[in-house]
Amino acid sequence: ANSNSRPHLLQTQKPFSVVLAISITFYLLLLNKVNSEEALSFTFTKFVSNQDELLLQGDALVSSKGELQLTRVENGQPIPHSVGRALYSDPVHIWDSSTGSVASFVTSFTFVVEAPNENKTADGIAFFLAPPDTQVQSLGGFLGLFNSSVYNSSNQILAVEFDTFSNSWDPTARHIGIDVNSIESTRTATWGWRNGEVAIVLITYVAPAETLIASLTYPSSQTSYILSAAVDLKSILPEWVRVGFSAATGRSAGYVETHDVLSWSFTSTLETGNSGAKQNNAHLASYALI
């Protein structure tokens, strides 16, 4: 991969209160913008079978508990060689070539990764944006998103991964990473995965500041993990994308886990705003990271 073209990231572990303050700041920043050109918003507090708003790929299904079960479970146990994805059915207008404007977005979701053996976990789950016709890719460490670890701008994929297995292109520990057109993350932060516990994720993109922030919090321990990146969506994604989740289990027997999404909300707003508003928003975004 061309590391020189990849964004700088802030990686840290912060108390829950700090993450909450940052999250609220960015959420309000997005919602208080004016001159909206297009907006898309949806919320799933639970999921139901045959839901028109969802496109399920691979092994993904809605469980009897109303959860998005991305990888296969047989007789109560996760199995290897499984990959599944779930996407929102309506494409998102993420940027406009006629005006040059780029959408801001915020998404929040809860998920659980549970493994029978804490010493044999694989492979992880990701939230991603990709072209509307995106299909399942390779399983295992590629998380159903890519077929190679080589950076390729034609992939047109932006993802935030929650990775439980160390592949050859990964750091040596479980981690959170931001992926730009490659499964080899641009930067990573160590993730203290907690087996079977609910994680709360907030991912925000503030277009005027070209800033992407991802945070994961375990309420049970008030432990949080944060990544921040400068990301130019126009250089990565097509104008229209689909958003969703992808997950995969390991290729070897025993290296398995469940990947269940419990709830999900998403809001995007494509703005026309003036330059002064953009400067003010960019300043606020920068200030929130100090």
From Swiss-Prot:
<feature type="glycosylation site" description="N-linked (GlcNAc...) asparagine">
    <location>
        <position position="152"/>
    </location>
</feature>
<feature type="binding site">
    <location>
        <position position="163"/>
    </location>
    <ligand>
        <name>Mn(2+)</name>
    </ligand>
</feature>
<feature type="glycosylation site" description="N-linked (GlcNAc...) asparagine">
    <location>
        <position position="147"/>
    </location>
</feature>
<feature type="binding site">
    <location>
        <position position="170"/>
    </location>
    <ligand>
        <name>Ca(2+)</name>
    </ligand>
</feature>
<dbReference type="GO" id="GO:0030246">
    <property type="term" value="F:carbohydrate binding"/>
</dbReference>
<dbReference type="GO" id="GO:0046872">
    <property type="term" value="F:metal ion binding"/>
</dbReference>
<dbReference type="Pfam" id="PF00139">
    <property type="entry name" value="Lectin_legB"/>
</dbReference>
<protein>
    <recommendedName>
        <fullName>Lectin-related protein</fullName>
    </recommendedName>
</protein>
<keyword id="KW-0430">Lectin</keyword>
<comment type="function">
    <text>Does not have any carbohydrate binding or agglutination activity.</text>
</comment>
<feature type="binding site">
    <location>
        <position position="175"/>
    </location>
    <ligand>
        <name>Mn(2+)</name>
    </ligand>
</feature>
<keyword id="KW-0464">Manganese</keyword>
<feature type="binding site">
    <location>
        <position position="170"/>
    </location>
    <ligand>
        <name>Mn(2+)</name>
    </ligand>
</feature>
<keyword id="KW-0732">Signal</keyword>
<dbReference type="InterPro" id="IPR013320">
    <property type="entry name" value="ConA-like_dom_sf"/>
</dbReference>
<keyword id="KW-0106">Calcium</keyword>
<feature type="binding site">
    <location>
        <position position="163"/>
    </location>
    <ligand>
        <name>Ca(2+)</name>
    </ligand>
</feature>
<feature type="binding site">
    <location>
        <position position="161"/>
    </location>
    <ligand>
        <name>Mn(2+)</name>
    </ligand>
</feature>
<feature type="binding site">
    <location>
        <position position="167"/>
    </location>
    <ligand>
        <name>Ca(2+)</name>
    </ligand>
</feature>
<keyword id="KW-0479">Metal-binding</keyword>
<keyword id="KW-0325">Glycoprotein</keyword>
<dbReference type="InterPro" id="IPR019825">
    <property type="entry name" value="Lectin_legB_Mn/Ca_BS"/>
</dbReference>
<comment type="similarity">
    <text>Belongs to the leguminous lectin family.</text>
</comment>
<feature type="signal peptide">
    <location>
        <begin position="1"/>
        <end position="36"/>
    </location>
</feature>
<dbReference type="InterPro" id="IPR001220">
    <property type="entry name" value="Legume_lectin_dom"/>
</dbReference>
<dbReference type="InterPro" id="IPR050258">
    <property type="entry name" value="Leguminous_Lectin"/>
</dbReference>
<dbReference type="InterPro" id="IPR000985">
    <property type="entry name" value="Lectin_LegA_CS"/>
</dbReference>
<feature type="glycosylation site" description="N-linked (GlcNAc...) asparagine">
    <location>
        <position position="119"/>
    </location>
</feature>
<comment type="subunit">
    <text>Homotetramer.</text>
</comment>
<dbReference type="InterPro" id="IPR016363">
    <property type="entry name" value="L-lectin"/>
</dbReference>
